[in-house]
Amino acid sequence: MFDPASFVEEIGPQLRQKLGNEKVLAAVSGGVDSTTAAVLAYNLLGDKVIPVLVDTGFLRKNEAEKIKDYLSNILPNLIIVDKKETFISEIEGIDDAEMKRKRFRELFYSTISSLMKKFNARYLMQGTIAADWVETQGGIKTQHNVLVQIGIDTEKEWGFTLIEPLADLYKNEVRELARYLKLPKEISERQPFPGPGLLVRAVGKLTREKLEVVREANDIVEKYLDPFNYSQYFAVSFESYGNLVNLDGIDAFLYKARATGVKGDVRAYGNIAKIECSNINNVKNIIDTLVKYDITHVLCTLDERNSGKYSVAIRAVTTEDFMTADYVRIPKEILSKISSEILQKIPNVKEVLYDVTSKPPATIEFE
């Protein structure tokens, strides 16, 4: 059983010995992993730790300002660096999920490298956890913060040495550590958020319009589902284009957009399918059939209209360790409220869907 006090007692001397009087740049995304790593280091080493949040343009609605406010007392020297236009303009137009993640990684660490030179820091601390490197090593999807574990020499590539104090912990253990370190609950209980952020929730080719659709939709989903404390919940958006097919007697709509999944222990990159289902609790047999046909995510229609360009899918799961997960059976009235507000507030959304796929065969995120 994980004991956060023992963990801090053990890792403290290791960090002090390794880092000495060197400056450390701590990359903070606002998520629980990176923030816990930064606070752990700051508590141990003080002002030698320089926490930095890079605003990539892929953060949630008003996120940079919220993070600054949440952390004002525990990371008072947090620096926010605005790189929105750099990231969006460089990745705009890329449609492959892995290419988007890898381009994000290149831009992110080039930015970090420049900041480290500016602050004369030799070490980079980040919040990589066990689930990140397990997925990357397994080829399921590239986690932008997994470097050393896949043979990338950070000294040679970008001129810094990487420190990852949480690399052997899983999400539930990181949350325990965050509570022990007295992080505000807005951080310790915060929704998991991928390093590339909304980039991987704007499924398929990145456009500025799609990015703003998913930013607004995600905000609505979080507002309604926050009280339920599900393990993870969010929205994704993609173009509504596709075609009807019949697979083993099942009518399905296959979108042109594709999404990641897991088959065995390896990555799958397959179709997103929509089915008509009157009861989201009773779709297992349909999903078992469809995943044989290169389908990674199965969605049910919640609400739709004749106009609009984009589909918005709601994703909510329960999980202990994020290595496997089950989709949540959200009450119908809650889903109805969410879908109604999305259609009301975002004019270019054609339909709202609910993801009824567990992990495996789907990954939690779509990209």
UniProtKB/Swiss-Prot annotation:
Alphabetized Pfam families for the sequence: GMP_synt_C, NAD_synthase
Please, which domain of life does this record's source organism belong to? Answer: Archaea
Q: What is its EC number?
A: 6.3.5.2
* CDD domains in alphabetical order: GMP_synthase_C
KW Nucleotide-binding (keyword) present: yes
Which InterPro entries does the protein's record reference? GMP_synth_C, GMP_synthase_B, GMPS_ATP_PPase_dom, NAD/GMP_synthase, Rossmann-like_a/b/a_fold
Which reaction does this enzyme catalyse, per its entry?
XMP + L-glutamine + ATP + H2O = GMP + L-glutamate + AMP + diphosphate + 2 H(+)
Q: Name one GO molecular function term.
A: ATP binding
Question: What keywords would UniProt list here?
Answer: ATP-binding, GMP biosynthesis, Ligase, Nucleotide-binding, Purine biosynthesis
* Keyword presence, ATP-binding: yes
Q: Under which pathway is this protein filed?
A: Purine metabolism; GMP biosynthesis; GMP from XMP (L-Gln route): step 1/1
Q: Which residues of the sequence carry a binding annotation for ATP?
A: 29-35
Which parts of the sequence belong to the GMPS ATP-PPase domain? 2-190
Root EC class = ligase
**How does this protein assemble?**
Heterodimer composed of a glutamine amidotransferase subunit (A) and a GMP-binding subunit (B).
The role this protein plays is:
Catalyzes the synthesis of GMP from XMP.
What is the official name of this protein in its record?
GMP synthase [glutamine-hydrolyzing] subunit B
